Amino acid sequence: MYEYRSSRRALFTIISVGIALLTVSILHSGYSQSPSTFSVSSMVLGKDKPVSMAIDEKTSKIYGIFATSSGEKNLLYVIDVAQNKVIDTIKIGSQKNDFLTNIAIDPDRSIIYAAGQHLVNENGSDIAYDTLYVINSTNYKFKRIQLYGETEEGKEGSLAGISFNPVTNTIYLGSLYPEGGKPGLYVIDGKSLQPILIDKWQYGIKDIQLDPESHLLYAGAKYDNLISVIDESNNLIIDNITAQSPIAITLDKEKNILYEAGSDGKVNAIDLKSKKNISSIQGESVKNILYNPNDKLLYIVDQNLTNILSKNSNVTKSMAIAVNTTNNIINKFETDFIVDNIIINPSTNQVYLSGYDGNNSKLFIIKPQ
């Protein structure tokens, strides 16, 4: 999704938070021992599982990709957060042939961009095409832009992160292949919808963070163990930052800090001037991170895998915490839902989380700090 998307060596201090989902390893001595609890409301969305979501801040609508219990992933929910209700559900293409995975919004042109996969039978073989779906958010008419295809059986990767730059009208799509395929970063002009592939990585890109003001793009290469800094004006890599299996990245432009979450559950703060890690937060299974420039808090979504696998349905399975710029944990929120997604409406400073408990999905609404 697009968001307008220490000092000297010291002994690490480790603290437990809540159910010990998170421990904090920091280079600062001051931190909150007892973070307060977020003020949270929620609404039931339905029986389908949320996959990805993005918000149109102009209309106060959240668009979410949802998966059914039978594995269909072509369902789009439209949630009006002003009315606190789902106002529409739309099927994009065919439930047997179209599988959407990630979503971004162009609010100025009323367009939804979704990364996904389209299955086509060619000469008796099922070919899986990595596909960009361009969806009109008014009438939900759509077109598919096929990027790369191979036989479905044995296909080892797919499109991953998606981000949109409204200043240049450009879509960015990460292509992640741990084996074979066509890994890299697609750069797609929003007017012509013609793709260019940057293929400078062995395995490709998992997540993307844009900074339109500096014309820089940060691309997290999960299996290459690095974050590439790309000049958007010429699509050239100007720097590479070593990072351990980055799965999510977010940017504090004011302090010039890039936060990255790795597959090991650790969230690192990287000083973009020195390219050095200046602090770390150790989680168990961090799924998403997002920095909010309005309240200057870093939001972290973490999961407790032991409790998720447990038969006990009344235990904490996910936690969201907010960390300030000096690594104080300010607030936390625990739930027995499995939470993956977090978005922020920059106009209202409202934070939204989506989760699923095996029976129902919920939208959690965190009141502004």
What is each model feature region?
Residues L22-Q369:
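Predominantly soluble domains enriched in secretory-pathway, periplasmic, or organellar proteins
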Residues R8-R9, K61:
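Basic side chains
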Residues R9-A20:
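Sec-dependent N-terminal signal peptides
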Residues M1-S7:
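N-terminal secretory signal peptides that target proteins for export/translocation
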